[in-house]
Amino acid sequence: MESAEIARRWLAFFEKRDHVVVPSTPLVADDPELLFVVAGMQPFKPYFRGDAPAPWPRATSVQKVLRTPDIDEVGKTTRHATFFHMCGNFSFGDYFKETAIPLAWELLTTPVADGGYGFAPDRLWVTVYTDDDEAADIWHRVVGLPVDRIQRRGMADNFWSMGVPGPCGPCSEIYYDRGPEFGVGGGPVANEERYLEVWNLVFMQYERGPGGAKDNYPILGELPAKNIDTGMGLERMAAILQGVDNIYEIDTTRPILDKAAELTGQRYGSGGQNDVRLRMVADHIRAITMLVNDGVVPSNEERGYVLRRLMRRVVRAMRLLGAREPTMHELVATAIAVFTPQYPELSRNAERIFAVADGEEASFFSTLAAGTARFEAAVREAGGGVLSGEQAFVLHDTYGFPIDLTLEMAAEQGVTVDEEGFRALMAEQRRRAKEDAERRKTGAADRAAYRAAAELLGRPVEFTGYTERSGEAVVRGLLVDGAAVPAAHAGQRVEVVLDRTPFYAEGGGQLPDHGVLEFAAGRIDVDDVQQPLPGLIVHRGRVADGEITVGETVLARIDVDRRWAISRSHTATHMVHKAFREFLGDTAAQAGSENAPGRFRFDFTNPSAVPPSVLGEVEERVNDLLLHDLEVTAQIMRQQEAIASGAIAMFGEKYGDQVRVISIGDWSRELCGGTHVPHTGHLGVIKIVSESSIGAGVRRIEALVGLDAYRYLAREAVLVSQLAEQLKAPADELPDRIAGMLARLRDAEKELEKLRQARLLAEAPRLAAARVDVGGLAVVAARVDGDGVDADGLRLLATDLRQRLGGSAVVVLAGVAGGRPVVVAAVGSEALARGVKAGELVGVAAKRLGGGGGGRPDFAQGGGTNPAAVDDAVSAALDAVRAQVG
């Protein structure tokens, strides 16, 4: 019975018994206490706790679930998985044990022809909580289960909770006896490999408190009603009904496992560590595909870290299995094909899923080999003892190894890791990074000098720039080369602290004001303004004339044109942010920005590239609002009041109790301390010029505003006019005209490539005739020259020769393509049986070329950096064949 049919029967059975079918929620938990959905009941948690009234008295679902506490056991046992489906039926104060137990028994034992799962009653066992006599009595008296197949267990096994504060209760688990071939008898208390848990009935009636161990945690009291929460693992049920040994061999997992075996040249079922790795890869790929589909992207924190860890475990496992090229794309494609019938959105989101998976694999693949070598060297240094925290830190910082991966690899080698030392170094790195960022903002002076200046000032610098463009101020401090001085003279770089200023200090993505500080004897040209400490604004510049002294009065005057240009950019950023939220949803949250004169960039969260059509809609939306000349206003209010009014706060930003809210008409409201124009009409025009990725799940647009945008559009118009003249076509026909030219060019290139390959394949008869007999094998080891030589051409020629020479063929070809040497090897079935492997031959040849390579036993490819060694590489490969079979 296919997994989809098992799920369909589940939902149909309970729907007929007045349960409402509820679709699965995404894996991302809407729960502050959990990263992911870890149980089928989790979406219903508020109803169990009485926090909200249940919309229905009964419900049923097939819920996607992700659990990683037992990640190290995945692939090693027959039952552990990270991603799986939990079939559940739920009662919110409607029925309890007396109904839940018979319903479960009915579905399990009803014949397949009648819509059930057709379990033989004598193969089923149950466990109940130690003192749950009521459940035991129902199993025996109502269902008719013999007493000797009802076993009792303690809190650790038969009292269920999610592991965090929330609903909990005693449970009764149903087990299937797979037979004596899976081990000793005696029921689930004796052997959980033979007796496989298929269904857990939780009698949800208590509230769990925080803390405590799995077998002893606090119970705060009873829930408002007695509820039922049951969970049947779809994958475990499929293993039983499909007659396979474990959950990795069912219809929704085995295709992925087989693809991993195919990509690595392995054969599943031979036992040993490779089987474990193949099972682990199959499981993790399922989880990866579903996580990315549900919006998770790789990162170093929380959900993203879990995804990254899963991905990097797959990459490493595939490499250990023999893969030398990226494989994630094909593995994920297999998972998408498997699950699309149940989840059509996978097909729609395929390109986004591929992009995330391929990008993360490429990132890790580039450092994996070097990182593994570094790890092995560290293990040798440890001498079977402890891998230092410093070594683990280097693996993390330089090679991208999550600490969990290092711990796993170390355990395989029988080595422990100094985790405490590693975490101390990580904390130190974060501290230094924070200080470096602050130092970049603070310039030459250290923080002690700034603290002294702030203490001397005695109060925050008064910022007048929201309403003033110039004004008198008193010099309260001067710093030269990081030290406080009483005066600074012409030619010196100086940092000036004033008691009040119209200059805006860089912050919130807005670049600082420029301008001048004029005094009786001269002036200072200000080219940077920073706020190294809260309330302390520092003006940096060069004394152009005269000598400035502490206590002197200056006229602080900003560059008004620059301020206006930056303000236009800042207002434009707010508008673009709001428009992206309109077209992409609230997930398009601001992740950073830079507002400069005439241009701005805006970073926002989004799992994939924004389609050009959406960029066009965003651009049209904001420019339309410029024509409406909306008023831009600022208002100071309490933070809670601002958020309640709908104002958007930037994620990760810290705000005080009093905040400044910028409103653009009634359309946009954001918390912001920057400067803005009074009306949107002042912006003129906004033009988005690019959209790109700056990290997993984060996109960046670059845009122009005002005259800069106009000049860009004018240049574009000139270019279009020139192209139209060159191609003798109207502007609106240019895309089709250019597309036609490119198509013809591609066709010509394909024909040229065919001619090159044909010329190269014409060498096959000559090379075949020149074969060498080595122990009965037909060996062609040759250098190939000509303008058709490249990796593709050599692969075609090697394949052709192998077909010509039959099972005894051993073909090694090398040449120079684009100044770099390439080597390929192809081996026939008879030669394979005699121990000749293409990967080993390529390895020998590539070593002479100063490089490396790999592939399948019957076909492999490599390269190097030394084209002068091609002949030597071919000879070395021939010698290797002779050594093997000669």
Swiss-Prot record:
Please provide an example of a Pfam family that matches this protein in its UniProt record: tRNA_SAD
Mind telling me which PROSITE patterns this protein's record contains? Answer: AA_TRNA_LIGASE_II_ALA
Question: What CDD domains does its record include?
Answer: AlaRS_core
For this UniProt record, the keywords arranged alphabetically read as follows:
Aminoacyl-tRNA synthetase, ATP-binding, Cytoplasm, Ligase, Metal-binding, Nucleotide-binding, Protein biosynthesis, RNA-binding, tRNA-binding, Zinc
Coiled-coil intervals: none
Q: Sorted alphabetically, which InterPro entries does this protein's record hold?
A: aa-tRNA-synth_II/BPL/LPL, Ala-tRNA-lgiase_IIc, Ala-tRNA-ligase_IIc_anticod-bd, Ala-tRNA-synth_IIc_core, Ala-tRNA-synth_IIc_N, Ala-tRNA_ligase, Ala_tRNA_ligase_euk/bac, DHHA1_dom
Q: What is its EC number?
A: 6.1.1.7
Q: What is its cofactor?
A: Zn(2+)
Q: Which reaction does this enzyme catalyse, per its entry?
A: tRNA(Ala) + L-alanine + ATP = L-alanyl-tRNA(Ala) + AMP + diphosphate
Q: Which residues bind Zn(2+)?
A: H570, H574, C672, H676
An example GO CC term for this entry is: cytosol
Cofactor: bound how, per the entry note?
Answer: Binds 1 zinc ion per subunit.
The similarity annotation says:
Belongs to the class-II aminoacyl-tRNA synthetase family.
Q: NCBIfam families annotated for this entry?
A: alaS (TIGR00344)
Q: What does this protein do?
A: Catalyzes the attachment of alanine to tRNA(Ala) in a two-step reaction: alanine is first activated by ATP to form Ala-AMP and then transferred to the acceptor end of tRNA(Ala). Also edits incorrectly charged Ser-tRNA(Ala) and Gly-tRNA(Ala) via its editing domain.
Per the record, what about its domains?
A: Consists of three domains; the N-terminal catalytic domain, the editing domain and the C-terminal C-Ala domain. The editing domain removes incorrectly charged amino acids, while the C-Ala domain, along with tRNA(Ala), serves as a bridge to cooperatively bring together the editing and aminoacylation centers thus stimulating deacylation of misacylated tRNAs.
Q: What is this protein called?
A: Alanine--tRNA ligase
Originating species? Acidothermus cellulolyticus (strain ATCC 43068 / DSM 8971 / 11B)
